[in-house]
């Protein structure tokens, strides 16, 4: 549908300070899901050609934003949205002093989610994911990445990826899928991590690539996950089959996973609390984005902060995501992550907003088509009843989203 947006205060998130400051009242022309024209309405500023391009008579639908703020659609670039089971009881047990080792002995931890996810059908996984997705949509997202990683068998990982892709048919949202079979060691491979990695490389990755079920492959490279050599084997297999790579790296220790991810031109290295300057320099010398996950940091009551000042000094792009998952970040609100990134990690509101727009798009490989309001980019927007973009990081709980536009189609979240 061709759509004309009128009387919008634009926050384009283009490079520089100007991209963060709301514009005077402006118009945006959309055709075939793309932005085709941008204009302020200051008399005499627009060329005759621009005025013609933005003529309301040339559009099927016109929306008057009545001075509301128009931002790029927010992007959640790291989620574990699809899973079955509930681990609220573990949350309560931990707060009553039960150590994680004891919880795991009682059948809890990540393997409890694996069991529940294996038992669920694809349709059940979709149904369970929708309320979580609805929470993210209510926080202004138009795109989300969704990982597998709770199946840990060929059949169940594929089931998860299919469920994730099916979410696009249920809601107005763009879903990008990532294979995370190397998330944990399944019980069938206990004590045989190398054999499991071989299974991922020989069996799971080729089929996922052949059926186009994911665009990226991720690995939990950590002392309690998979080591550098195992991670590199997965990265090699992913590259061989034309898939991007990403890494869960330096969350609990400094293994060098971020540097490895950068060496393989990974889209992003995520968590990175224990990242050192060598790792930061590797990011600076690559196109790999540093993705911050403040929800997990908060929920786990971590104390090791990611190296924000080093990332700034080396001009490494920083993205922010919910990391929504049942064990360490049960948060379905991306704007809450903006607040956490500012209060816990001391990002500025501008850095935080760029982390869920321009830099989040880069973390998914869409840096040339999403995350910025610019001619030629996807017509994905979020519409807000706020005075300034900093309000998104500053306020928590107020429902300020008016609507979203996905591929040029308007979705009301309270209406105009």
From Swiss-Prot:
Catalytic activity, EC: 3.5.2.7
Query: Which keywords are on file for this protein?
Result: Cytoplasm, Histidine metabolism, Hydrolase, Iron, Metal-binding, Zinc
Record localization? Cytoplasm
The UniProt record gives the binding positions of Fe(3+) as 78, 80, 248, 323
Q: What Pfam families does UniProt report for this protein, alphabetically?
A: Amidohydro_1
Q: Which pathway does it operate in?
A: Amino-acid degradation; L-histidine degradation into L-glutamate; N-formimidoyl-L-glutamate from L-histidine: step 3/3
Listed InterPro entries: Amidohydro-rel, HutI, Metal-dep_hydrolase_composite, Metal_Hydrolase
Its recorded reaction(s) are: 4-imidazolone-5-propanoate + H2O = N-formimidoyl-L-glutamate
Where is 4-imidazolone-5-propanoate bound in this sequence? 87, 150, 183, 251, 328
Sequence positions that bind Zn(2+): 78, 80, 248, 323
One GO cellular component from the entry?
Answer: cytoplasm
Q: How is the cofactor bound?
A: Binds 1 zinc or iron ion per subunit.
GO BP annotations listed:
L-histidine catabolic process to glutamate and formamide; L-histidine catabolic process to glutamate and formate
Function, as annotated, reads:
Catalyzes the hydrolytic cleavage of the carbon-nitrogen bond in imidazolone-5-propanoate to yield N-formimidoyl-L-glutamate. It is the third step in the universal histidine degradation pathway.
What HAMAP family does the record point to? HutI
The protein here is known as Imidazolonepropionase
The scientific name of the source species is Vibrio campbellii (strain ATCC BAA-1116)
């Amino acid at each position: 549908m061709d759509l004309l947006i009128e009387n919008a205060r634009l926050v384009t998130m283009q490079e520089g300070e100007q991209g963060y400051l709301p514009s005077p009242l402006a118009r945006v022309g959309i055709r075939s899901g793309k932005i085709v024209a941008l204009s302020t309405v200051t008399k005499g500023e627009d060329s005759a050609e621009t005025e013609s391009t933005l003529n309301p008579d040339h559009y099927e639908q016109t929306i008057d934003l009545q001075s509301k703020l128009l931002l790029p659609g927010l992007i959640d670039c790291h989620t574990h949205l699809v899973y079955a089971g509930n681990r609220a009881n573990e949350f309560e047990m931990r707060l009553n002093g039960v150590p994680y080792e004891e919880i795991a002995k009682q059948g809890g931890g990540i393997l409890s989610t694996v069991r529940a996810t294996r038992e669920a059908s694809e349709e059940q996984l979709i149904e369970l994911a929708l309320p979580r997705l609805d929470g993210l949509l209510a926080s202004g997202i138009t795109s989300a990445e969704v990982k597998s990683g709770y199946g840990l068998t060929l059949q169940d990982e594929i089931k998860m990826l299919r469920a994730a892709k099916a979410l696009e048919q249920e809601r107005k949202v763009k879903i990008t899928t990532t294979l995370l079979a190397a998330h944990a060691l399944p019980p069938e491979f206990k004590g045989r991590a190398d054999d499991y990695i071989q299974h991922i490389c020989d069996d799971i990755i080729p089929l996922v690539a052949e059926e186009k079920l994911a665009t990226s492959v991720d690995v939990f490279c950590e002392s309690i996950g998979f080591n550098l050599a195992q991670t590199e084997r997965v990265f090699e297999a992913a590259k061989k089959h034309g898939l991007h790579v990403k890494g869960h790296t330096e969350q609990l220790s400094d293994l060098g996973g971020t540097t490895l991810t950068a060496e393989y031109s990974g889209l992003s290295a995520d968590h990175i609390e224990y990242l050192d300057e060598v790792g930061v320099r590797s990011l600076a010398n690559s196109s790999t984005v540093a993705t911050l996950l403040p929800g997990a940091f908060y929920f786990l009551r971590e104390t090791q902060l990611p190296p924000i000042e080093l990332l700034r000094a080396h001009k490494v792009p920083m993205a922010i995501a919910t990391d929504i998952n049942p064990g360490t970040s049960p948060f379905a609100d991306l704007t809450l992550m903006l607040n956490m990134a500012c209060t816990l990690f001391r990002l500025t509101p501008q850095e935080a907003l760029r982390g869920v727009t321009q830099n989040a798009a880069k973390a998914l490989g869409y840096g040339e088509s999403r995350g910025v309001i610019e001619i030629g980019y996807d017509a994905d927007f979020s519409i807000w009843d706020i005075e300034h973009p900093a309000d998104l990081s500053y306020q928590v709980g107020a429902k300020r989203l008016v609507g979203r536009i996905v591929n040029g189609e308007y979705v009301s979240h309270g209406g105009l």
